[in-house]
Amino acid sequence: VTDTAPRPTLEAVAARAGVSRATVSRVVNGGDGVRDVLVERVRKAVEELGYVPNQAARSLVTRRHDAVAVVVAEPETRVFADPFFALQLRGISKELTAHDNQLVLLLTEGRDDHARVGRYLAGGHVDGALVFSLHLDDPLPELIQRAGVPTVFGGRPGWSGDRRDVVYVDSDNRGGARDAVRHLVGLGRTRIAHLTGALDQTSAVDRLDGYRDVMVDADPRLIVEADFTPAGGERAMRQLLDRCPDVDAVFAANDLTASGALRVLREAGRRVPDDVAVIGFDDMLPVAEQTDPPLTTVRQDIEEMGRLMARLLLRDLDRGTSHEGVAGTPAGVVLPTTLVRRASA
């Protein structure tokens, strides 16, 4: 059954509250200059009548859509298979919801998708954008800059040159990697390998650099490129065992890569951690707790990264300034990491 009752109007709210239509409009749209007693009367009338502001009309007044685009530079097959994205999206969604903003999810896989997203952002449909999982050759930053949309990036941007206008939230990938490798060294391991992430992403590059900070003279054959996926971890681990059968420890670029490596080690009859110690990165639950054995890993607060990205963007939108213009606030925010010890190392 369809409810055909007319929606309450601005005029009806004004009549109920005993104020002018202009006063109701200012209160509903967050304007200043209305006495507290009148604000309370308007809010009471809105609640009693069930009045819902017309978003299109409200946007004309506030120049805000109360919508934020979340752009993930990955195909949907990876986004919906990797818990990392779910955790980051959950953090973003919680923060946006708390401020009555809508999340508009945009995924990009190829050139056509990039052009589509660029047109959408330039079309004025959203107030700002949150962008993560960028690749070094990604055209999205240029498209976003052209669109003139306030943006916060997830992860350290990989562009060359001084871009002080870039706002980003990241984890201490390099420091976390150093902690992981130092732990393996402390266990007495000497043939410590690294299964990297996709090296066109700064998180993978930073973790590789952290490994190299500790393993200065490491055999280059101990570094094998993977792609942050379980299948990539399996391929890289098989390649590593062929190259360096004497490997006694593995630092994997993320937990999914580590889970693939653990499967291959088990198939090869290598005991973990007796024969080969394994450490991951992320501490994604339940993945890290359900591997066999449970995974020692570097914890980054993925959900908090998402919340902080959204918080920075909303704060800048409220102030009507770029993040760079906010005194005392750095353009890049780097969150700490922690080594979580379980049975694998």
Predicted regions and their residues:
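Alpha-helical recognition/docking segments in bacterial nutrient-uptake
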Residues: 1-5, 67-71, 75-182
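N-terminal helix-turn-helix DNA-binding module of bacterial transcription factors
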Residues: 1-66
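Short beta-strand segments enriched in small/hydrophobic residues
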Residues: 23, 63-77, 183, 192-197
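Glycine-rich phosphate-binding loop signature in dinucleotide/nucleotide-binding domains
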Residues: 49, 187-188, 240-246
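Hinge/beta->alpha junction and helix N-cap segments in small-molecule ligand-binding domains
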Residues: 74-87, 105-114, 169-179, 195-238, ...
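Periplasmic-binding protein-like
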Residues: 126-132, 193-195, 223, 244-254, ...
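Flexible loop/turn connectors
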Residues: 243-345
